């Protein structure tokens, strides 16, 4: 068995790579590691999923794995990933399990695991779970009354909506938003949350049938949202992915507001309100150089981490900071959650618009992005290729040619057999040329 956990849990093609048998093994192993019985009595686990078709099969397997290890299951049904993380903490569960492949196509699925308090797992805990799943460490297997039971949480969505309401001090009355729910886990709660806050809401791609999740919609396909915002004369559009742990925006003209621009707007607002701890923002190495420049000009320190909101969260926790995120739209507010929360991000972004009376385009203009080119190269062994001397020499040469006018980032994907090549430069043609040359080198190794 190869390593199961990537940068965001276990993920693969459902029923071939991520099978029901593997899901049961992983869940049983997670229960063994995270929910060993103690003086507090029987342990519980929160289980949720996105609406893709394979979710029902994998949910049954995960529930079987958890209960076979003596853990009671609190099934919250179809809800966003951040809702499962929140409910894991709110319901005092020993762990939480979200069944989702996030922005991936419908045939894929995944398993994300949260520890008590709704926190993502660190590498050491993942290693222990993998050891149990592989059979090198004994798993728990109680009998009789020791086997776990299952119950649903009928008010799970309402609990999450009430939690979101506490994060927005002002009304969104007067704002019109188009929200693209990607036919995913936010199809019910995102429009409800925005309406409850006072916004006029036009919901699109909010009719999941198990097969249409992320299909030409959501945060990876903004075309329908951009068109709808202009057609409805909306103030902005918000796009979520399949499990709603991310949020991207478009302005009234349909232009993209990415995660870096969203973080700029939020960081400046929190700075002005005295809520930005140590005037520090946490972002990943993928954030545009323009974000670094904007934060420096605003007197805000930018701390960078590895890619993945779990690493952003680690950076936030280690420094006690109050805002962090990724260019992809994962934004973390530690005061309100332990993982990226797309719906919360949308609320806070609109809250800043309502507070200032400014259009999102004007607020986002505080950051000017450098042209960025990202090329994904499919390879047989992503780590070996990324560490190849030939590739490393090519990166050094590209960096030398850019000098202070850009940067190069080359890294293996955490979820797929890809090497990602990213080049930023003041001239888009220079960035494109260097990115293509590096991608060619990667492909040739």
Curated annotation (Swiss-Prot):
Q: What is a GO molecular function of this protein?
A: phosphoglucosamine mutase activity
Gene3D superfamilies given for it? Alpha-D-Glucose-1,6-Bisphosphate, subunit A, domain 3, Alpha-D-phosphohexomutase, C-terminal domain
Record-level GO cellular component terms: cytosol
Q: How is it modified after translation?
A: Activated by phosphorylation.
CDD domains reported in the protein's UniProt record: GlmM (cd05802)
Query: Record's SUPFAM superfamilies?
Result: Phosphoglucomutase, C-terminal domain, Phosphoglucomutase, first 3 domains
Q: Keyword set for this entry?
A: Isomerase, Magnesium, Metal-binding, Phosphoprotein
Q: What does this protein do?
A: Catalyzes the conversion of glucosamine-6-phosphate to glucosamine-1-phosphate.
- The molecule here is called Phosphoglucosamine mutase
Look up and give the organism this protein is from.
Answer: Rhodococcus jostii (strain RHA1)
């Amino acid at each position: 068995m190869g390593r199961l956990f990537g940068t965001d849990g276990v993920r693969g093609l459902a029923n071939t790579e991520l099978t029901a048998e593997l899901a049961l093994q992983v869940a049983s192993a997670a229960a063994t590691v995270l929910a060993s019985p103690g003086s507090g009595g029987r342990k519980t686990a929160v289980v949720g999923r996105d609406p893709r078709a394979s979710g029902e099969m994998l949910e049954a397997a995960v529930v079987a794995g958890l209960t076979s290890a003596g853990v009671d299951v609190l099934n919250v049904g179809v809800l966003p990933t951040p809702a499962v993380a929140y409910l894991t903490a709110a319901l005092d569960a020993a762990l939480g399990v979200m069944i989702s492949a996030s922005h991936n196509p419908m045939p894929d699925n995944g398993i994300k695991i949260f520890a008590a308090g709704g926190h993502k797992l660190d590498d050491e805990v993942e290693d222990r779970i993998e050891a149990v799943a592989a059979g090198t460490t004994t798993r728990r297997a109680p009998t009789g009354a020791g086997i776990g039971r299952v119950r649903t949480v009928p008010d799970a969505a309402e609990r999450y909506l009430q939690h979101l309401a506490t994060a927005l001090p002002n009304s969104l009355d007067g704002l019109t938003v188009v929200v693209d729910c990607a036919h995913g886990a936010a199809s019910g709660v995102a429009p409800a949350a925005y309406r409850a806050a006072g916004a006029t809401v036009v919901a699109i791609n909010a009719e999941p049938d198990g097969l249409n999740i992320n299909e030409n919609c959501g945060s990876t396909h903004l075309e329908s949202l951009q068109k709808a915002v202009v057609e409805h004369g909306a103030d902005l559009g918000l796009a979520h992915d399949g499990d709603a742990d991310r949020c991207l925006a478009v302005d009234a003209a349909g232009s993209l507001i990415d995660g870096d621009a969203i973080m700029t707007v939020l960081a400046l607002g929190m700075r002005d309100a005295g809520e930005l701890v140590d005037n520090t923002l946490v972002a990943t190495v993928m954030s545009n150089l323009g974000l670094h420049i904007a934060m420096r000009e605003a007197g805000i320190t930018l701390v960078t981490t590895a890619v993945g909101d779990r690493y952003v969260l680690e950076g936030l926790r280690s420094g006690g900071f109050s805002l962090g995120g990724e260019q992809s739209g994962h934004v973390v507010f530690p005061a309100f959650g332990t993982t990226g929360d797309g719906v919360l991000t949308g609320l806070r972004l609109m809250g800043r618009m309502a507070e200032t009376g400014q259009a999102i385009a004007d607020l986002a203009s505080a950051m000017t992005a450098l042209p960025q080119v990202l090329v994904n190269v499919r390879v047989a062994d992503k780590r070996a290729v990324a560490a190849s001397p030939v590739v490393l020499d090519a990166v050094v040469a590209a960096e030398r040619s850019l000098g202070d006018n850009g940067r190069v980032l080359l890294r293996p994907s955490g979820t797929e057999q890809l090497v990602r090549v990213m080049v930023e430069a003041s001239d888009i043609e220079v960035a494109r040329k260097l990115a293509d040359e590096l991608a060619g080198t990667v492909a040739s190794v």
